[in-house]
Amino acid sequence: MGVARHWFAALVGVDPATVATGAAVSQLLAPVAAAVPDGTRVLVPDVEFTSNVFPWAVHTDRGVTVRTAPVDRLADAIARDVDVVAFSAVQSATGEVADVAAISQAARDVGALSVMDTSQAIGWLPVDPNAADLQVCAAYKWLCSPRGTAFLVHHPALAERHPGITSRLRPLAAGWFAGEVPHESYYGPPLRLARDARRFDISPAWHCWVGAAPALQVLAATGAGAIGEHNVALADSFLTALDQPPSNSAIVSVPADDAAVARLTAAGVRFGVRAGRVRVAFHLYSTADDVDMAIGALRG
Protein backbone atom coordinates (compact mmCIF):
# COMPACT_ATOMS: atom_id res chain seq x y z
CA MET A 1 0.00 0.00 0.00
CA GLY A 2 2.86 2.34 0.71
CA VAL A 3 4.20 1.70 -2.79
CA ALA A 4 0.84 2.59 -4.34
CA ARG A 5 0.66 5.75 -2.22
CA HIS A 6 4.16 6.71 -3.36
CA TRP A 7 3.38 6.35 -7.06
CA PHE A 8 0.02 8.08 -6.76
CA ALA A 9 1.70 11.02 -5.03
CA ALA A 10 4.36 11.10 -7.76
CA LEU A 11 1.71 11.13 -10.47
CA VAL A 12 -0.33 13.89 -8.83
CA GLY A 13 2.64 15.91 -7.60
CA VAL A 14 2.00 15.89 -3.85
CA ASP A 15 3.75 14.77 -0.67
CA PRO A 16 2.79 11.16 0.18
CA ALA A 17 2.22 12.33 3.77
CA THR A 18 -0.84 14.26 2.55
CA VAL A 19 -2.42 11.18 0.95
CA ALA A 20 -4.93 8.92 2.68
CA THR A 21 -5.93 5.58 1.18
CA GLY A 22 -9.32 3.98 1.21
CA ALA A 23 -11.79 1.86 -0.70
CA ALA A 24 -14.14 4.38 -2.31
CA VAL A 25 -14.76 8.09 -2.80
CA SER A 26 -17.82 8.17 -0.54
CA GLN A 27 -15.97 6.35 2.25
CA LEU A 28 -13.09 8.83 2.15
CA LEU A 29 -15.43 11.84 2.09
CA ALA A 30 -17.58 10.61 4.98
CA PRO A 31 -15.27 11.97 7.73
CA VAL A 32 -15.08 15.33 5.96
CA ALA A 33 -18.84 15.62 5.66
CA ALA A 34 -19.22 14.61 9.30
CA ALA A 35 -16.82 17.39 10.30
CA VAL A 36 -18.68 20.31 8.72
CA PRO A 37 -20.77 22.40 11.14
CA ASP A 38 -24.53 22.12 11.47
CA GLY A 39 -26.25 24.21 8.83
CA THR A 40 -23.40 23.98 6.32
CA ARG A 41 -24.44 25.02 2.81
CA VAL A 42 -23.01 22.80 0.06
CA LEU A 43 -22.94 23.65 -3.64
CA VAL A 44 -22.51 20.90 -6.26
CA PRO A 45 -22.93 20.73 -10.06
CA ASP A 46 -26.42 19.85 -11.23
CA VAL A 47 -25.05 16.63 -12.74
CA GLU A 48 -22.60 15.25 -10.18
CA PHE A 49 -21.89 11.61 -9.38
CA THR A 50 -23.59 10.74 -6.11
CA SER A 51 -20.38 9.66 -4.35
CA ASN A 52 -19.65 13.39 -4.05
CA VAL A 53 -23.24 14.31 -3.17
CA PHE A 54 -24.68 11.72 -0.81
CA PRO A 55 -21.93 12.07 1.85
CA TRP A 56 -23.13 15.66 2.34
CA ALA A 57 -26.83 15.01 1.84
CA VAL A 58 -27.05 12.42 4.62
CA HIS A 59 -26.46 15.25 7.10
CA THR A 60 -29.67 17.12 6.31
CA ASP A 61 -30.93 16.11 9.75
CA ARG A 62 -28.52 18.63 11.23
CA GLY A 63 -29.32 21.38 8.77
CA VAL A 64 -26.79 20.68 6.03
CA THR A 65 -28.24 21.73 2.67
CA VAL A 66 -27.16 20.78 -0.85
CA ARG A 67 -28.01 22.93 -3.84
CA THR A 68 -26.90 22.76 -7.46
CA ALA A 69 -25.72 24.89 -10.37
CA PRO A 70 -24.56 23.99 -13.90
CA VAL A 71 -20.88 23.10 -13.86
CA ASP A 72 -20.05 25.73 -16.48
CA ARG A 73 -21.54 28.38 -14.18
CA LEU A 74 -20.44 26.87 -10.89
CA ALA A 75 -17.73 29.46 -10.21
CA ASP A 76 -20.25 32.29 -10.72
CA ALA A 77 -22.69 30.62 -8.30
CA ILE A 78 -20.18 30.61 -5.45
CA ALA A 79 -20.99 33.39 -2.98
CA ARG A 80 -20.86 34.13 0.73
CA ASP A 81 -23.82 31.84 1.29
CA VAL A 82 -21.76 28.81 0.20
CA ASP A 83 -19.65 26.92 2.75
CA VAL A 84 -18.55 23.88 0.70
CA VAL A 85 -18.09 23.47 -3.04
CA ALA A 86 -17.95 19.81 -4.12
CA PHE A 87 -17.38 19.11 -7.81
CA SER A 88 -15.74 16.76 -10.30
CA ALA A 89 -12.78 17.86 -12.39
CA VAL A 90 -14.27 15.90 -15.29
CA GLN A 91 -17.94 14.99 -15.56
CA SER A 92 -18.36 11.24 -15.89
CA ALA A 93 -21.36 11.15 -18.25
CA THR A 94 -20.31 13.76 -20.80
CA GLY A 95 -16.57 14.21 -20.28
CA GLU A 96 -17.00 17.94 -19.68
CA VAL A 97 -13.85 19.38 -18.10
CA ALA A 98 -14.57 21.80 -15.28
CA ASP A 99 -12.75 25.11 -14.90
CA VAL A 100 -10.86 23.86 -11.87
CA ALA A 101 -8.85 27.04 -11.38
CA ALA A 102 -11.88 29.35 -11.49
CA ILE A 103 -14.01 27.17 -9.21
CA SER A 104 -11.25 26.68 -6.66
CA GLN A 105 -10.36 30.37 -6.61
CA ALA A 106 -13.99 31.41 -6.26
CA ALA A 107 -14.34 29.06 -3.29
CA ARG A 108 -11.18 30.44 -1.72
CA ASP A 109 -12.37 34.02 -2.21
CA VAL A 110 -15.43 33.41 -0.02
CA GLY A 111 -13.74 31.05 2.44
CA ALA A 112 -15.58 27.94 1.22
CA LEU A 113 -14.06 24.48 1.46
CA SER A 114 -13.36 23.11 -2.04
CA VAL A 115 -13.64 19.35 -2.54
CA MET A 116 -12.73 18.02 -5.98
CA ASP A 117 -13.44 14.50 -7.25
CA THR A 118 -10.68 13.66 -9.72
CA SER A 119 -11.79 10.09 -10.46
CA GLN A 120 -12.39 10.87 -14.14
CA ALA A 121 -9.30 13.08 -14.50
CA ILE A 122 -6.22 11.79 -12.70
CA GLY A 123 -4.35 9.49 -15.04
CA TRP A 124 -4.86 11.52 -18.20
CA LEU A 125 -5.51 15.16 -17.24
CA PRO A 126 -2.83 17.14 -15.38
CA VAL A 127 -4.61 18.73 -12.41
CA ASP A 128 -3.11 21.47 -10.26
CA PRO A 129 -2.38 19.75 -6.92
CA ASN A 130 -2.81 23.09 -5.15
CA ALA A 131 -6.20 23.93 -6.64
CA ALA A 132 -8.64 22.37 -4.17
CA ASP A 133 -8.52 21.94 -0.41
CA LEU A 134 -9.29 18.24 -0.78
CA GLN A 135 -8.95 15.97 -3.79
CA VAL A 136 -10.52 12.53 -3.83
CA CYS A 137 -10.07 9.85 -6.47
CA ALA A 138 -11.35 6.35 -7.15
CA ALA A 139 -8.38 4.49 -8.60
CA TYR A 140 -10.28 1.86 -10.59
CA LYS A 141 -11.07 4.34 -13.36
CA TRP A 142 -8.20 6.08 -15.16
CA LEU A 143 -5.60 4.78 -12.72
CA CYS A 144 -6.18 1.25 -14.05
CA SER A 145 -6.32 -0.19 -10.53
CA PRO A 146 -8.61 -2.82 -9.03
CA ARG A 147 -11.89 -1.78 -7.46
CA GLY A 148 -11.55 -1.08 -3.77
CA THR A 149 -8.70 1.44 -4.14
CA ALA A 150 -9.10 5.19 -3.65
CA PHE A 151 -7.12 8.21 -2.47
CA LEU A 152 -7.82 11.45 -0.60
CA VAL A 153 -5.32 14.32 -0.77
CA HIS A 154 -5.31 16.92 2.02
CA HIS A 155 -3.90 20.28 0.93
CA PRO A 156 -0.99 21.25 3.22
CA ALA A 157 -2.79 24.52 4.04
CA LEU A 158 -6.09 22.83 4.92
CA ALA A 159 -5.77 23.44 8.67
CA GLU A 160 -4.81 27.08 8.13
CA ARG A 161 -7.65 27.76 5.70
CA HIS A 162 -10.36 25.84 7.54
CA PRO A 163 -9.41 25.50 11.22
CA GLY A 164 -12.97 24.86 12.35
CA ILE A 165 -13.49 21.88 10.09
CA THR A 166 -10.04 20.43 10.63
CA SER A 167 -10.45 20.64 14.40
CA ARG A 168 -13.43 18.28 14.06
CA LEU A 169 -11.99 16.16 11.26
CA ARG A 170 -11.21 12.69 12.57
CA PRO A 171 -11.31 9.12 11.25
CA LEU A 172 -14.68 7.39 11.39
CA ALA A 173 -13.21 3.92 10.96
CA ALA A 174 -9.91 4.14 12.83
CA GLY A 175 -8.15 0.83 13.21
CA TRP A 176 -4.67 -0.56 13.52
CA PHE A 177 -3.75 0.57 10.00
CA ALA A 178 -4.40 4.19 10.99
CA GLY A 179 -1.77 3.99 13.72
CA GLU A 180 1.48 5.94 13.66
CA VAL A 181 3.27 2.58 13.47
CA PRO A 182 0.62 0.15 12.20
CA HIS A 183 2.39 -3.03 13.27
CA GLU A 184 2.73 -1.63 16.78
CA SER A 185 -0.97 -0.74 16.89
CA TYR A 186 -2.53 -4.18 17.12
CA TYR A 187 -3.71 -3.76 20.70
CA GLY A 188 -4.66 -0.78 22.75
CA PRO A 189 -5.44 1.73 24.21
CA PRO A 190 -4.07 4.37 24.21
CA LEU A 191 -5.08 5.90 20.88
CA ARG A 192 -1.98 6.51 18.76
CA LEU A 193 -3.10 7.65 15.33
CA ALA A 194 -0.67 8.56 12.56
CA ARG A 195 0.23 12.23 12.59
CA ASP A 196 -0.28 12.68 8.85
CA ALA A 197 -3.03 11.74 6.39
CA ARG A 198 -2.44 8.05 7.08
CA ARG A 199 -4.70 8.40 10.12
CA PHE A 200 -7.58 8.15 7.65
CA ASP A 201 -6.32 4.87 6.14
CA ILE A 202 -8.48 1.81 6.58
CA SER A 203 -7.27 -1.76 6.77
CA PRO A 204 -6.65 -2.57 3.10
CA ALA A 205 -8.04 -5.24 0.85
CA TRP A 206 -4.51 -6.43 0.16
CA HIS A 207 -4.95 -7.95 -3.29
CA CYS A 208 -6.45 -4.71 -4.60
CA TRP A 209 -3.35 -2.77 -3.65
CA VAL A 210 -1.00 -5.39 -5.06
CA GLY A 211 -2.63 -4.66 -8.42
CA ALA A 212 -2.71 -0.90 -7.95
CA ALA A 213 1.00 -0.38 -7.29
CA PRO A 214 2.40 -1.43 -10.71
CA ALA A 215 -0.42 0.32 -12.57
CA LEU A 216 0.32 3.58 -10.78
CA GLN A 217 4.03 3.18 -11.41
CA VAL A 218 3.44 2.91 -15.17
CA LEU A 219 1.16 5.95 -15.18
CA ALA A 220 3.56 8.04 -13.11
CA ALA A 221 6.49 7.08 -15.32
CA THR A 222 4.57 7.96 -18.48
CA GLY A 223 3.08 11.19 -17.14
CA ALA A 224 -0.47 12.51 -17.30
CA GLY A 225 0.47 15.10 -19.91
CA ALA A 226 1.70 12.58 -22.45
CA ILE A 227 -1.19 10.23 -21.73
CA GLY A 228 -3.68 13.07 -22.10
CA GLU A 229 -2.30 14.13 -25.48
CA HIS A 230 -2.65 10.56 -26.73
CA ASN A 231 -6.14 10.12 -25.32
CA VAL A 232 -7.58 13.43 -26.51
CA ALA A 233 -6.13 12.93 -30.00
CA LEU A 234 -8.00 9.64 -30.27
CA ALA A 235 -11.17 11.19 -28.86
CA ASP A 236 -10.98 14.03 -31.39
CA SER A 237 -10.41 11.54 -34.20
CA PHE A 238 -13.55 9.73 -33.08
CA LEU A 239 -15.55 12.98 -32.99
CA THR A 240 -14.24 14.16 -36.36
CA ALA A 241 -15.34 10.91 -37.99
CA LEU A 242 -18.85 11.64 -36.71
CA ASP A 243 -18.76 15.26 -37.91
CA GLN A 244 -18.65 16.47 -34.32
CA PRO A 245 -16.46 19.35 -33.10
CA PRO A 246 -13.24 18.44 -31.25
CA SER A 247 -13.15 18.38 -27.47
CA ASN A 248 -10.63 18.77 -24.66
CA SER A 249 -11.59 15.50 -23.00
CA ALA A 250 -10.70 11.82 -23.26
CA ILE A 251 -14.38 11.03 -22.61
CA VAL A 252 -16.87 11.66 -25.39
CA SER A 253 -20.64 11.33 -25.54
CA VAL A 254 -22.65 11.10 -28.76
CA PRO A 255 -26.29 10.39 -29.66
CA ALA A 256 -27.04 6.79 -30.57
CA ASP A 257 -30.20 4.79 -31.13
CA ASP A 258 -30.90 1.25 -29.94
CA ALA A 259 -29.62 -0.24 -33.19
CA ALA A 260 -26.27 1.52 -32.82
CA VAL A 261 -26.01 0.35 -29.23
CA ALA A 262 -26.65 -3.22 -30.38
CA ARG A 263 -23.97 -2.95 -33.08
CA LEU A 264 -21.42 -1.60 -30.61
CA THR A 265 -22.17 -4.48 -28.26
CA ALA A 266 -21.87 -7.05 -31.04
CA ALA A 267 -18.53 -5.56 -32.13
CA GLY A 268 -17.13 -5.96 -28.62
CA VAL A 269 -16.81 -2.24 -27.95
CA ARG A 270 -16.82 -1.31 -24.28
CA PHE A 271 -19.03 1.73 -23.75
CA GLY A 272 -21.64 3.23 -21.47
CA VAL A 273 -25.09 4.68 -22.09
CA ARG A 274 -26.03 7.83 -20.23
CA ALA A 275 -29.28 9.72 -20.88
CA GLY A 276 -29.73 8.19 -24.32
CA ARG A 277 -26.17 8.91 -25.42
CA VAL A 278 -23.27 6.55 -25.94
CA ARG A 279 -20.20 7.32 -23.85
CA VAL A 280 -16.79 6.10 -24.93
CA ALA A 281 -13.36 6.91 -23.57
CA PHE A 282 -9.79 6.50 -24.73
CA HIS A 283 -6.76 5.72 -22.59
CA LEU A 284 -3.08 4.95 -23.05
CA TYR A 285 -3.81 1.41 -24.26
CA SER A 286 -6.33 2.61 -26.90
CA THR A 287 -5.34 2.77 -30.57
CA ALA A 288 -6.51 4.23 -33.87
CA ASP A 289 -7.84 0.77 -34.72
CA ASP A 290 -10.12 1.01 -31.68
CA VAL A 291 -11.48 4.31 -33.01
CA ASP A 292 -12.14 2.75 -36.42
CA MET A 293 -13.88 -0.24 -34.84
CA ALA A 294 -16.20 1.98 -32.79
CA ILE A 295 -16.97 4.26 -35.73
CA GLY A 296 -17.69 1.30 -37.97
CA ALA A 297 -20.12 -0.13 -35.43
CA LEU A 298 -21.89 3.20 -34.94
CA ARG A 299 -22.34 3.74 -38.66
CA GLY A 300 -23.49 0.18 -39.31
Task: List PLM regions with ranges.
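Pyridoxal 5′-phosphate
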Residues: 1-300
